[in-house]
Amino acid sequence: MIRAKKSLGQNFLIDKNIIDKIVNTVPITDNEILEVGPGTGNLTRKILENNPKKMYLVEKDTFLAKSLEEIDNERVKIFNDDILKFDEKSLSKNQIIVFGNLPYNISTEILSKWITNLKNDYWFSDLIL
């Protein structure tokens, strides 16, 4: 069993009903998806069932990023990186749907980073957090 690291503000999404509700909030098929903090990949796997065009996973925890490689899917690209330093705009020329079970300890910083740049750059179409 994988334990959440408090130092990284981790919390893992495991309730299948909540995962279903989250995934059903926006159309996923043929869209590009960025998932922030995919953790154990429960939400990732459900999103993949809905056939996104491409899926980008940004996971800071090296152990979890490595374990996500078990999701053997050509549409998935895994980045073992810190979302606060990550350049989301470099992923695609298209707008991306963002899913995230954000780490509690940096959620304000993440949102501030994204919202600050909204005036000049609309790199995402939806935020499902």
Identify the role of each PLM range.
Residues 1-129:
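Catalytic cores of RNA-modifying enzymes
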